[in-house]
Amino acid sequence: MGNCNRTQKPSSSSNNLEKPPQAAEFRRTAEPSLYGRYNCKCCWFADKNLITCSDHYLCLRCHQIMLRNSELCNICWKPLPTSIRVPLEASAPDL
C-alpha cells in the first residue's frame, strides 16, 4: 500500500543517543595548577588516580560507584566516561 519501495530515513533523535562514548584521561598524579592541587569532586579526599569527567576530576572509586547507579555523573549530569585512556608517563627523569 502506498510507497512500499521508499526507504525511511533514520530520525535525528536516534542519532543523538548512539554517540560513541569519549575516552576519559587517567592521571596517576594530577597536573599542578595555579590554585593548588586537584581533588576528586565527589569525595574531596583522593588526589591520585583521577579521571577527567567533563569539567572536573573523579577518583576511580567514586567513578565506579556512579557507574553502578546510573550512566550520568551526579555532579555535572553529563554521561560518565566508560573507557579510560592511560597516557604514557615517564617512570624516571630524563638524564
From Swiss-Prot:
UniProt keywords (A-Z) are: Host cell membrane, Host cytoplasm, Host membrane, Host-virus interaction, Lipoprotein, Membrane, Metal-binding, Myristate, Viral budding, Viral budding via the host ESCRT complexes, Viral release from host cell, Virion, Zinc, Zinc-finger
The RING-type zinc finger ranges are: 40-76
Q: Which InterPro entries match?
A: RING_finger_Z_arenaviridae, Z_RING-type_Znf_sf, Z_RING_Znf
Organism domain of life: Viruses
Q: Where is the lipid attached (N-myristoyl glycine)?
A: G2
Asked if the record carries the keyword tRNA-binding, the reply is no
Q: Where along the sequence does the record place the motif called ASAP motif?
A: 90-93
Q: Where is this region: Disordered?
A: 1-25
Describe the processing and modification events after translation. Answer: Myristoylation is required for the role of RING finger protein Z in assembly and budding.
Please tell me whether the keyword Metal-binding is annotated for this protein: yes
**Where does this one sit in the cell?**
Virion; Host cytoplasm, Host perinuclear region; Host cell membrane
Task: Indicate how the chain sits in the lipid bilayer.
Answer: Lipid-anchor
| Cellular component terms per the entry's GO annotation | host cell perinuclear region of cytoplasm; host cell plasma membrane; membrane; virion component
Primary location class: virion
Give the compositionally biased regions (Polar residues).
1-17
Q: What else is known?
A: Inhibition of host myristoylation by the compound DDD85646 leads to proteasomal degradation of protein Z (and not lysosomal), strong inhibition of Z-mediated assembly and budding, and reduced levels of viral replication and transcription.
Query: Tell me, how does this one assemble?
Result: Interacts with protein NP; this interaction probably directs the encapsidated genome to budding sites. Interacts (via RING domain) with polymerase L; this interaction inhibits viral transcription and replication, Z partially blocks the product exit tunnel for the releasing nascent RNA product. Interacts with the glycoprotein complex; this interaction plays a role in virion budding. Interacts with host eIF4E; this interaction results in eIF4E reduced affinity for its substrate, the 5'-m7 G cap structure.
Physiological role: Plays a crucial role in virion assembly and budding. Expressed late in the virus life cycle, it acts as an inhibitor of viral transcription and RNA synthesis by interacting with the viral polymerase L. Presumably recruits the NP encapsidated genome to cellular membranes at budding sites via direct interaction with NP. Plays critical roles in the final steps of viral release by interacting with host TSG101, a member of the vacuolar protein-sorting pathway and using other cellular host proteins involved in vesicle formation pathway.
Q: Which family does it belong to?
A: Belongs to the arenaviridae Z protein family.
Question: What's in the domain note?
Answer: Late-budding domains (L domains) are short sequence motifs essential for viral particle budding. They recruit proteins of the host ESCRT machinery (Endosomal Sorting Complex Required for Transport) or ESCRT-associated proteins.
> What's the protein called, per UniProt?
RING finger protein Z
Query: Corresponding gene?
Result: Z
